């Protein structure tokens, strides 16, 4: 299915399974966004976490899927959130994967729209009511390490 470009990861496979089994599910009208780093010098964005939305289009969940927390690797990655603009035709929505270098040499892949923000809003994380969420996530992760 990946070779045929029919799905974009496990989320689409879940959706196909729900459709096949006639299961009830909800699909948010606002497409997924991306949380990651913004480099003001190059103007590039490098997303590494999926941003999912509630029925009203507000941020509901951040899934740190490409930048896992591991012992010795607990860097902050969320400086900005990129979201598809409300009111723009969905045919303009794309989700791409690009190489992080040279602007993000420590990050192999970047997800989201990395430079052309015509159809996307790029908002600093501090503008959201959950601005400290990554700090808390790292705090809880580090606390969990003490339970070895």
At which residue positions do the language-model features occur?
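Glycosyltransferase catalytic domains, chiefly GT-A lineage
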Residues: 1-148
């Amino acid at each position: 299915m990946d070779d045929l470009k029919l799905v974009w990861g496990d989320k689409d496979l879940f959706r196909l399974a729900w459709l096949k089994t006639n299961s009830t599910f909800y699909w948010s009208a606002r497409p997924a966004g991306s949380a990651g780093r913004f480099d003001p010098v190059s103007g590039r964005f490098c997303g590494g976490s999926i941003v999912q939305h509630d029925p009203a289009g507000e941020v509901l969940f951040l899934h740190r899927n490409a930048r896992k927390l591991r012992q010795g690797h607990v860097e902050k990655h969320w400086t900005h959130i990129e979201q598809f603009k409300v009111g723009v035709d969905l045919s303009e929505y794309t989700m791409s994967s690009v190489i992080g270098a040279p602007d993000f040499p420590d990050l192999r892949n970047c997800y989201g729209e990395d430079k052309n923000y015509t159809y996307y809003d790029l908002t600093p994380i501090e503008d959201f009511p959950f601005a400290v969420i990554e700090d808390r996530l790292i705090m809880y992760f580090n606390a969990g390490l003490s339970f070895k």
